[in-house]
Amino acid sequence: MNYLQGTVDVMILKTLSGGPSHGFGISKAIRERSEGVLGLEDAALYQALHRMESKGWIESEWGLSENNRRAKFYQMTPDGERQLSIETVSWHRYALAVFKVLDLRFEARP
């Protein structure tokens, strides 16, 4: 699936706001929170993680996953928390504008 620029970053930051996670855990959380609608290909996920780490929004360290395998764990930095706040406001405004253009109302579906 193609995502608008910045979408992957804000989804990763939001996921990491709940605590550190490895790449597979981040991808799984996004898929589960979106009820299977959104998924990240490995290449897109790891490109975003490297980009965000170079910007200082996240940091990483090696550790052991739940199944005792070596994995790189990512966590959000204070700069990442600030960026998440900025991006959340921006996405909220964007989503509201698109809903208005499409003459839609947000309703949770059963």
Label for each model-derived stretch:
Residues N2-A44:
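N-terminal helix-turn-helix DNA-binding core of bacterial DNA-binding proteins
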Residues R82-P110:
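Amphipathic alpha-helical dimerization/coiled-coil segments
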Residues M76-G80:
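Accessory beta->alpha helical hairpin/"wing" motif in late/C-terminal subdomains of nucleic-acid enzymes
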Residues L45-M52:
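Basic amphipathic alpha-helical segments that dock to polyanions
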Residues E53-R70, Q75:
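Beta-hairpin "wing" of winged helix-turn-helix
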Residues K14, K28, Q47, S85, ...:
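A cross-family signal for key residues in well-ordered alpha-helices
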